[in-house]
Amino acid sequence: MQVLSTLTVGTKSNVSSDRKSHQWNKVDEKSGNYTTRDLVLERDMNNVTFNSRGNVKSGILLEPYTGKTIHFQRGQSNKTEGGSASNRDGGIQIDHVVAYAEAYRSGLDKLDFQQRDTYYNDPDVLLSSQAEANNVKKDGTIVEWEPSNQAFQCDYASLQIGIKAKYGLMVDQKEHDKLAQVLASCPTETIIS
């Protein structure tokens, strides 16, 4: 609750984000092709394998939003485990826990391009998620969307607060009240910012 009380409560801007101006950065840890997406997939999955280019090829994700297990295979749609029929995302998308458009409306638009790109690629902001759940979440706040996995709701609220605190992003009153309501049911939750 202490970190939540430090967030500015206000009215968010109604500007369109520049999300399409950003892409996953190359991360030099594995190879020249290893991106932020690979870093997050490797962090969040078990039994990870890599292709010859250094990208994550496969793995198993205990998906936090739904609580389901997803068998990731790069380049496959994986519709049976919640993948997008039209995408070849392996059933997993990398979600900005505070959606980029929501962050942009909450103050990210005041930061320069490099700072926004840092946000876009910050592993602390990103989570491997079921494509279907991420597509339903879109750019909603915790008022509009919560994980169906009850066991993850405290973590989700804490992540939202920590990310907003780290980047100096505001919340509106409804969002503040919903975060406080969720946190009241999990008083031992630690918020990392």
Set out the residue ranges of the language-model regions:
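Betabetaalpha-Me/HNH-type nuclease active-site subdomain
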Residues: 10-129, 134-138
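Short helix-coil boundary/hinge micro-motifs
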Residues: 1-6, 10-12
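Exposed alpha-helical structural elements
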Residues: 2-3, 36, 40, 155, ...
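C-terminal, well-folded lobe of enzymatic/effector domains
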Residues: 136-193
